[in-house]
Structures are given as C-alpha cells and as structure tokens.
C-alpha cells in the first residue's frame, strides 16, 4: 500500500469531518452543558429586564387585578401593583376594592355597567369570576 498525497489529504479531510461532527453533537444534544448558547437554545430563565405590563404600553390597567395591599405578620405594609403605580383603569372599566378571606385588600378593574350595556358582558359576572379566581 503506497502513501500518496491525494490519499493522505483525503484521510485528513475525513478525520477532520468526523472530529467536527462529534464535537458539534455535544453542543446540539446537550445545549445547557459547557458553553451554553453556542449552536444551542437561548437561556430559558427569567429576563434581567422588567417585562412590559399593559399599563406600561397603554397607560391604563385592563380587566383584572390592579393592586394588592398586604399587612405582614411583622406589621409591615406592602402594596403589590400589577399595573403602573399611578395607572387608572382603562376606558369602560371601573375600579372595585374588596377584601380576601385572609385579610388582603385588593383592587381590580371590572367592566362598568353603564359602558358595558352596549356589549353582552355584565360587570357582576366578570367581578364574580375574578373573585373566585382570587379565592383559589
């Protein structure tokens, strides 16, 4: 068997292809091991940036929870806001304040009856559905 330049170059090319394919399989098969991100899926976790809520985009709160007012066991008061701090309910919605069984006060935006008469949505139905979701 004679060693010639074409045979050596072909053997080296095949060897290079095999090494590259084996190396790439590790990245494609196990994307979170080693250098995650190279030829793999993006990081699947929480973003470092705050997501845009409906209040940030439209300047008002849509149907649903607007704020929660909690009093901790140590007496510390905390307000959790789902919308912007000073955002009002969107047009056609009114703000309703209520209290959960555990003593947490919350405000939510529900359809206004006078505005919703043009549609088939009743404010009391939406309010009861949202309230039942909160109690779960």
Swiss-Prot record:
- Signal peptide location: 1-24
Keywords (alphabetical) are: Amidation, Neuropeptide, Secreted, Signal
Q: Among the record's GO biological process terms, what is one?
A: neuropeptide signaling pathway
**Residue list for modification Methionine amide:** 33, 44
* Coiled-coil residue windows: none
Grouped into one coarse class, the protein's main location is: secreted
Does Glycoprotein count among this protein's keywords? no
Propeptide position ranges: 47-136
Q: Does the keyword Zinc apply?
A: no
List the subcellular locations. Secreted
A GO CC annotation given for this chain:
extracellular region
Q: Which family does it belong to?
A: Belongs to the SCP family.
Role summary? The cardioactive peptides enhance the contractions of the auricle in vitro.
Which named protein is this? Small cardioactive peptides
Q: Identify the species of origin.
A: Lymnaea stagnalis (Great pond snail)
Lineage summary: Eukaryota, Metazoa, Spiralia, Lophotrochozoa, Mollusca
Q: Which gene encodes it?
A: SCP
């Amino acid at each position: 068997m004679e060693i010639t330049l074409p045979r050596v170059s072909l053997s080296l090319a095949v060897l290079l292809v095999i090494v590259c394919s084996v190396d790439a399989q590790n990245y494609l098969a196990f994307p979170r091991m080693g250098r995650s991100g190279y030829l793999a899926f993006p990081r699947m976790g929480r973003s470092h940036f705050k997501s845009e809520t409906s209040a940030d985009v439209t300047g008002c709160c849509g149907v649903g929870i607007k704020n929660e007012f909690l009093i901790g066991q140590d007496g510390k008061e905390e307000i959790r806001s789902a919308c912007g701090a000073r955002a009002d309910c969107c047009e056609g919605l009114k703000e309703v304040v209520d209290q959960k069984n555990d003593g947490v006060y919350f405000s939510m935006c529900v359809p206004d009856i006078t505005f919703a008469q043009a549609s088939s949505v009743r404010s009391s139905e939406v309010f009861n559905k949202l309230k039942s979701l909160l109690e779960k």
